[in-house]
Amino acid sequence: MPINLALLLLLLCSLMTSTNFNTSKALQFHQELLGFSQDFDSINSPSMSPTFSSSPYYYTILPSPSPSPASAPLVPAFFVLGDSSVDCGTNNYLGTFARADRLPYGRDFDTHVPTGRFCNGRIPVDYLALRLGLPFVPSYLGQTGSVEDMIQGVNYASAAAGIIFSSGSELGQRISFTQQIQQFTDTYQEFIIDMGEDAAANLISNSVFYVSIGINDYIHYYLSNESNVQNVYLPWSFNQFLASSVSQEIKNLYNINVRKVVLMGLPPIGCAPHYLWKYNRENGECVEEINDMIMEFNFVMRYAIHELHQDLPDLDIIFCDMYEGSMDIIKNYEHYGFNVTTDACCGLGKFKGWLTCISPDMACDNASNHIWWDQFHPTDAVNAILADNVWNSLHTKMCYPMNLEDMVAPKS
């Protein structure tokens, strides 16, 4: 059997054996998603638990236990919206190829089992939750929906999701940015019913919202030229379009009492192993034409945030330039303790960028000396550094006009 066919069959088997649609919160969303019709190019569109497999590489996905926070909470709750950079298990409950519910994903996590995080260990919001004095944030589809489960935060992020509704559609089900905001709106309504409007508004306005979205609008839309988009939008126009869409969604969050937002810029995916392989880079040099688009988006988005500050003066919003923080690690890798900068820890092909991580046999022994975990995602070690930068600019300044520690510091 040709190797590519064999690997495709393995990937299909992993999808079929690791999902069983049967619990309330996820089943409700699954039914809504199946009944959802949407024009391909539209932007703002409107318990399933994995079963145990006889394979040693699959596990029942349970809620992730958190280490005890080191201090009293600095904010009431921590809410997360985004894509695979911060998905903590949402896609475990969806019919999709974009999933991380099998080893070696999660092998270096606190529990050493896969949780749905696209990493060998923790993702940035895990580190930041502990900094805030809160437990790890549970997935919206991975809990019962009771207010008690959600009172300290919810993670709505979904791998393959984008700002554009159809971004990532070729991978299967995913929850777009707009849909995630609708899910939060539903959560807010549950809070109002349970504790009253004033108490719910006070909780939300004092909580932190972390948004990491947009990379799939390049990977699975613009760079793949879906709907002939490259002939409709030049990169500059496409970036303006995305930034405008994000700004509008933040205004929508503001209208339901959100007042503290951390908006993440996009990382240098032109340096990701997949594009090093795809563009046949001989020596691992980054794909500059891709990185130029990402830098331009971050520039446009940062300016849009400046305008939001002027329009909504009581909105505390931070923009964190992931490109700056990530490139500092890539350029100064030895300073940070890395010695493998171009190859992923797990994958197949040159730079391990041809096929994503689907088997423990594909993974390196020591992920901590790698920058990249798989085709697109950084290792736990990189996530820890980036989280430090978001919190207090420990390694390099990448957040403007302040960092998260400043945002949540008690006001005198």
Feature-to-residue mapping (PLM):
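Conserved active-site regions of diverse hydrolases
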Residues: 2-412
